[in-house]
């Protein structure tokens, strides 16, 4: 499986298809094969996958079914090919430790359904790894369909939830019906959902370049019993935002995803450093088009799930250099190793003139 995989789809989906094809593999076999594969992705950095023999030899030397006593290589940093691109705010050893651990899945209960979520987890014999109010972390392989399919909770990493915690920011006062917020790269709507969980009366518009994504977004909001946002299909790569329309513009831009790679560790084996500049150019273009829509005194919130400076701090520096009317209020990395989550970069800018 490791030799044949080409990176075309997420490995967990590829693995699922392999298990379907090999119905003779029992549950213990599937669990063992999965653990072995992900041990390889997390630790075999730089190991050739040109032939199956190289992979097998490496696994025989380093892996046992008890990963607690497996000899984990520590010479090669998982991000070694892009190490000089990592933000100076992120410690390299901390990032390595973070990458080698399988992350939990984070759930957030909706509309006061925390008790129902906890009862369902108990019924499913699912251990709770972390809990804070309506946010719960469970093991990665937990079956959460009985919870998420009925809208009791939604899945969102704690890093993203922390990035949407605006309680200490001045823009929290704009999360009401009298102010307009635009989630201009909304994707499946996760950030907008959390915004409305935190501020139920917020006036939100969501846009994306993909119409089908917006249709799915509306279904998610309906399932979670949240007020549906206004939606628009907009390609901000090629379209300038309308002038002075929004008090807050939220840009969770497409990125390398390097701050989430421990969830999909295979990605690091297929990533080219040349992609960083490609993403950075796209990101700068998007926020330069979106900034036209920020009212005077309003805010631009820039977010990525990347650990690379070129996609984060450098973008903000370039943007402010070109657009002197904006000032940086703050920038930070949310989540990360300390919080058992993804690394989410968030910068808050204000249009002051």
Predicted regions and their residues:
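S-adenosylmethionine
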Residues: 1-353
